[in-house]
Structure formats: C-alpha cells, structure tokens
Amino acid sequence: LIQGDVGSGKTIVALLIIADVIKSGFQVVLMAPTEILANQHFDYFNKLLSPLNIKTEMLTGKTKNKKDNYARLKKKKIDILIGTHSVYNSSIEFYKLGLIVIDEQHKFGVRQRINLLEKSAGCHTLIMSATPIPRSLSFVMYGEISISNIKSKPQGRKEVVTSLINKNQIETLIEGIERKLIKNEQIFWILPTIGTLDSEEQTLITRYEYLKKRFKNKVGFIHGKVNKEDAERVMQDFKDQKIMILVSTTVIEVGINIPNATLMIIENVERFGLAQLHQLRGRVTRGNLQSNCVLIY
C-alpha cells in the first residue's frame, strides 16, 4: 500500500515500479475507478514510457475491438493494460502478469480486487490511496500488506485554504470567481446531483445554467451520463483553458490533474462524505499557485 495525500506523487512512484517490472519481462495491469482517470493515466504513461518502447493500451467498457486487445495481451504485445472495471473481465488472459496496480483503492470492492488477483498466481499487488479503507489498514496492522507512506508533497506546493459559507453568500463568491478569471485561473464547481431544469433544489444543470448566463462560453459541465467522446472533449477543453469553469458531479473526484485550477467549490456540502471532500479538495493542489476550497451549505 502506497499511502500519500492527494497530489503527493503516488502516480510517479507507481510508474517507476511499473517500468522496473516490465524491464524484468512481466506485464502490468493498472485499474482506475473512472474512465476520466483511466484516460489521464493512459496519456501520462504513454507519453513517458513509449520512448522506452513500452507498449501501453487502454480498456474500458466503451473500448472498441476488445477481442483484438485480448489477443495482443495473450501474445505479450501489450506491456501495460490501463482500464476501469473492464480489466477483470473473465475473457482476459495475460502472457505473464507480474504486477497489479489499483489506483484509488478505496473506490473498489473486495470481490473486484480478488477477481483481478486470480488472473495470476503469485502476482505482486500495488494499491494506492490517500484515504485507505479500514479493511486495508487492518491488513497492514496484521502484516498482510506492507505500507509505504509519502509524507511530503513536491516542493513549492501550497496548502489549500478551506472556508465554509452559506448559500445566501453566492454573489460574494461570484465576485471571487471573477477575480480568479482575471488572473486566468480555473475553477471546479461540484454538486451531488445532475437534476433537471425543473429541479427545486440546486443541481448540476440548474447551477450550470446560472453560471452560463454570467460567464457565457467560459463554462462547461461533465457528469457520469455524458458520453465518452463529449466527456473527453470537455476535459481536453478544460486542460487547454478553453473552458475556465467546470461544473461537475463527483466524477472528477479522483486523480484529475489540472495544475491551473485554483478554486474548488462544493455545493450542498452536507451531501458528501469526508473522504469525498478530501479527494475533491485535492483537485486544486496540483500547481504552485495558492488554492482555495469553498464549501457551501
């Protein structure tokens, strides 16, 4: 178990371990809880490892030509398989699986992890989380899992400043957003439900429409029901700063890396768990700029 706070560098540690395992002639599978995070990992690993002739492939529920990928895995034409829950499909056979990496381990159930472990007897397992589940910590206590703690963050990172406001103070918050936009900094605005325009409570759709009227085409949205192509386009536009305010559900909770995002707004905060809040707040500690997290109740 690699335990380290959000933004502490768990992914780069995993990448170095993975490269060493592949150098020894084995394959690696990395499982992430969401397609957005799996996509991000694929881009990151492919960029750094392809110059070393390490072949990375992605597999999710929406991947086309799955059978072709299965055949390539069995013939060891794929070194790293990155994906969501699809990677423990019973149809998948590895040539020589040496390491299983489970990112954001607290997001997966016990049976899901066991299914993956059954793919290769004696396979090493690396699990990563800023908020490990009690079951994993109990395994650490009894010596069944070794633990490595990353106790510091990369040099230059600043602590996020967290504040709590009432929903009646939204206008004051909007003024703060305008100041952030003047400095060309980006904003996440998180809500617990998607909703509709007719929703009585504040939901993703109603808040998006409100912000769209104020900030025009600087606002985008994403949630779990957005199709893969649109989700990838929105996230790329956010990375490219074509979108400056991203309204979202917790689909961006884990792993998303946008160094220019410095403000995290979480509305209806009483509807979220502590681990969720900690993960969400970690989305704005990715660069060297001062970041803020505003909780609205």
PLM regions: where:
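Inter-lobe coupling/hinge segments of SF2-like helicase ATPases
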Residues: 1-297
